[in-house]
Curated annotation (Swiss-Prot):
Domain of life: Viruses
Encoding gene (name): 31
InterPro entries, per the entry: DUF7257 (IPR055681), Minor_tail_gp31_C (IPR056923)
Pfam families, sorted: DUF7257 (PF23918), Phage_tail_C (PF24243)
Protein name: Gene 31 protein
High-level lineage: Viruses, Duplodnaviria, Heunggongvirae, Uroviricota, Caudoviricetes
Natural source organism: Mycobacterium phage D29
Length: 617
């Protein structure tokens, strides 16, 4: 791996800074001299002075270029929505003669660099000098560096305080206006050289301001692309440290009427077709707002993709990357716009909208504030704080941290700007509040709308500080292929295969025949053999009695289950017990009657006490 060893090597062919350490420690060791070396210019002459001034104005972010609106008459609506459009509008005005340079408003603009630096200079210069405390201690130093470079480009030695230098620059611009008509012949050559420097190629034909401006406009796209990649990388790193959900949307598709699939959309004033503006993915890379009418309209989006629509735990982390169109800030005659990041959203939000959740709102006059919604009612918490934005800005909202589930944090480009502790749990927490989403609002301004930021990527992660994600894993997104048995899976693709692999009982076969599960793990018919009836019943079912059970003077043979008449012998003497004993006295159960002659009676050897003897003669 190689690392840049001089500042210019740290800038790629596309104009983006390359992260790689080296001799400049990710840019933290840049000095004022190194910064100045990045702005080296050729000698200033009458035929290149205006061009050099333009070159440095083109390095300003869109927010700064938009300040020229009030100085340029008859600019087309939407011309200042992009860096390329803003440059085109300014250059078109110059083609008619730089009359706007005479206006006192330009001095006001330069003075505002001192009084309102955060709003005027915008996101990009602040990010460029972020961390360079040894060289540029304050925003004023940043402004002074830019003003000094412009003065030096015009051959003026900077003197006095910053305000004096701004007035000097304004005076020189007035002089340039007077001499602009003399240098028109040199502009074409300058633009050709400018285009060549940007692309590394010599032009085959004369170039106009449009071609170099398009190259510069691409820098905004590069910035948001890099930020999107950084957000995705951070989401993947979070996924390694935590189980649960890791997902999001990069909007890499075309949808000219909405932002789906994967989102439930809700508009307070109607979406596509309402004439009040809407979000769509027209360039195939970002969700951007289309201005329509002059009324306020809020768009809310709730995630519905089954892969990442809800987190596993109450610990959530979401990022949103601003696209190439930063939202309009509020001004004297502008309502501005805002975006919101939403976490802990109610489970039924895809059908009823967001009734519960925690959020951060970024917008208005470059401000942000945390808040929550409970049962449809919004509540801001804490105080609003300064928060500017630009192409590629990464916003992060965290609900639940290592310090507690009630902690809510907001970050911009990795730096925490706000913390709220919901100690009373005023917001909703639990399994019914684990969805997420985002929103953008266009506010009315004069005859138009304040355009909200475009969005190039959103991500979502479980953020359980234990790293366990509640002991749960989203198998659909967290497992590639078949989860094997040693890892807690079944090693199978079907239920039958899983039962076989795990040694589970077989499924009960379909049918109406009674069966039982035998010890050899097979299903067998349930019959008399299975229950042991064959040991007590040696007859076939056909031999069983099927007649009504009516017995009259019958006996049953135990050998063959047959019925026979009761023989008289079975009822004779000795067959029935004839005596019973009551209180020790034998009492006959029956009495025998004897009938015979006197001679026969006398001939009886013994007489029975239980027999009645009747003699006939």
């Amino acid at each position: 791996m190689t690392f840049p060893t001089n500042p210019l090597e740290a800038i790629g062919a596309d104009g983006a800074f390359e992260i790689g350490g080296g001799d400049f420690s990710f840019g933290q060791d840049y000095t004022e001299q190194i910064i100045r070396s990045l702005f080296t210019m050729p000698p200033v002459r009458l035929d290149n002075a205006i061009t050099l001034l333009r070159e440095h104005l083109l390095k300003l972010p869109l927010e700064a270029l938009q300040r020229f609106k009030e100085m340029i008459p008859d600019w087309a609506e939407g011309a200042f929505d992009t860096a390329t459009g803003a440059v085109d509008a300014i250059m078109d005005a110059l083609s008619e003669g730089p009359l706007f340079l005479k206006l006192a408003e330009f001095q006001v603009f330069l003075q505002r660099l001192l009084t309102e630096p955060g709003e005027v200079i915008g996101e990009i210069p602040q990010a460029l000098v972020n961390g360079l405390t040894s060289a540029l201690e304050t925003v004023n130093n940043t402004i002074q560096t830019i003003v000094d470079m412009l003065l030096q480009a015009l051959g003026i030695n900077p003197k006095g305080d910053l305000l004096d230098r701004i007035f000097d620059l304004s005076d020189e611009i007035e002089w340039l206006r007077d001499t602009a008509s003399q240098v028109a012949s040199g502009l074409q050559q300058t633009w050709n050289h400018f285009w060549s420097a940007l692309t590394g190629r010599s032009p085959g034909e004369d170039q106009t301001v449009v071609e170099p401006a398009e190259q510069i406009g691409e820098l905004a796209g590069t910035t948001q692309s890099n930020s999107s990649a950084i957000a995705e990388l951070q989401a993947r790193l979070d996924a390694q440290d935590h189980t649960g959900i890791a997902g999001g949307d990069d909007f890499e598709r075309v949808n000219t009427t909405a932002v789906g699939p994967g989102w439930a959309e809700f508009y307070t004033g109607g979406g596509y077709g309402s004439g009040r503006g809407y979000y769509a993915i027209k360039d195939g890379h970002q969700a951007e707002w289309t201005d329509q009418g002059a009324t306020q309209n809020t768009a809310r989006f709730v995630r519905t993709d089954p892969a990442d629509e809800k987190t596993v735990t109450d610990y959530q982390k979401m990022t949103l990357v601003v696209g190439t169109i930063p939202g309009e800030a509020a001004g004297l005659f502008r309502g501005g716009s805002h975006i919101r990041l939403w976490l802990r959203v109610n489970d039924n939000a895809p059908t009823v909208g967001i009734t519960d959740g925690v959020y951060v709102e970024v917008g208005g006059a470059n401000l942000a504030q945390l808040g929550y919604r409970r049962r449809g009612s919004d509540h801001f918490v804490g105080s609003a704080f300064n928060c500017s934005w630009g192409a590629g800005t990464i916003f992060t909202l965290v609900a639940g941290t290592v310090d507690g589930i009630e902690k809510v944090e907001f970050y911009k480009n990795g730096s925490r700007l706000a913390l709220w502790s919901d100690d009373g749990l005023r917001s909703a927490i639990g399994a019914g509040f684990r969805r997420w989403g985002w929103e953008g609002q266009a506010r009315n301004r004069n005859l138009g709308q304040g355009t909200p930021s475009s969005v190039t990527r959103v991500t979502i992660n479980d953020n359980d500080p234990s790293g366990l994600g509640g002991g749960s894993v989203h198998l659909e997104t967290g497992v590639v292929g078949i989860l094997q048995i040693p890892n807690g899976g079944t090693g199978a693709t079907s239920a039958a295969e899983a039962r076989a692999n795990l040694g589970a009982e077989a499924a009960i076969p379909a049918g109406t025949v009674a069966q039982y599960w035998r010890g050899d793990k097979t299903w067998q018919p349930l019959n008399k053999v299975a229950v042991g009836l064959h040991l007590v019943d040696n007859t076939s079912d056909a031999q069983k009695m099927s007649a009504p059970a009516v017995l009259t003077n019958k006996t049953i043979s135990g050998a063959d289950n047959t019925l026979t008449d009761i023989p008289v012998a079975a009822l004779g003497l000795g067959a029935v017990n004839a005596v019973r004993v009551i209180a020790g006295v034998p009492i006959p159960n029956s009495v025998t009657i004897w009938i015979g002659t006197e001679a026969q009676f006398q001939a009886l050897p013994t007489k029975d006490a239980n027999t009645l003897y009747f003699r006939t003669a």
